[in-house]
Curated annotation (Swiss-Prot):
Keywords: Cytoplasm, Fatty acid biosynthesis, Fatty acid metabolism, Lipid biosynthesis, Lipid metabolism, Magnesium, Metal-binding, Transferase. The keyword Nucleotide-binding does not apply. Transmembrane segments: none annotated. It catalyses: apo-[ACP] + CoA = holo-[ACP] + adenosine 3',5'-bisphosphate + H(+). It is an enzyme of class 2 (transferase). This is Holo-[acyl-carrier-protein] synthase. Its cofactor is Mg(2+). GO terms for molecular function: holo-[acyl-carrier-protein] synthase activity; magnesium ion binding.
Length: 126
C-alpha cells in the first residue's frame, strides 16, 4: 500500500459555536450526513460534535487533494465508528466516485479535542 493523501485540520470550537448561534442549524444541515444529523440532535455537546465532524471533513478534502468543490460536499464524507469506537469514513456520491478513480483501498481517521480545539487527520492509501 502507498499513501495517496494526508490531510489535517484544526478547528476552534468557539468559532463553530458562534456560527451555530448566528445561523442556527444551517451549518450542521450543510455538513452532516443524515445519520450524523441524528447523532448531533441527541448529543450532549452538539457543538463539540459538529466541530469534530467539520475537522474530519476538512482533513478528508485535503487528503483527497480537492478541497470542497467540483461536486464534492461535506456531507459526502460521513464519520462512522466501529464497535470499539474507532472512527473511519464512509464515502457517498462524488466522494465515493473519486475514491474509486484514485484507487483508494483504505481510509484512516484520527480525532482529538480539548477544551478549545478539535483536530483531525485523514490518511488515504492505495
Amino acid at each position: 500500500m502507498a499513501i495517496l493523501g494526508l490531510g489535517t485540520d484544526i478547528v476552534e470550537i468557539s468559532r463553530i459555536q458562534a456560527v451555530v448561534e448566528r445561523t442556527g442549524e444551517r451549518l450542521a444541515r450543510r455538513i452532516l450526513s443524515p445519520s450524523e444529523w441524528q447523532h448531533y440532535q441527541q448529543h450532549q455537546q452538539p457543538v463539540r460534535f459538529l466541530a469534530k465532524r467539520f475537522a474530519v471533513k476538512e482533513a478528508a478534502a485535503k487528503a483527497f487533494g480537492t478541497g470542497i468543490r467540483n461536486g464534492l460536499a461535506f456531507n459526502q464524507f460521513e464519520v462512522v465508528n466501529d464497535a470499539l469506537g474507532k472512527p473511519t469514513l464512509r464515502l457517498h456520491s462524488r466522494a465515493a466516485e473519486l475514491a474509486v478513480e484514485l484507487g483508494v483501498k483504505s481510509l484512516h481517521v484520527t480525532l482529538a479535542d480539548e477544551r478549545r480545539y478539535a483536530c483531525a487527520t485523514v490518511i488515504i492509501e492505495s
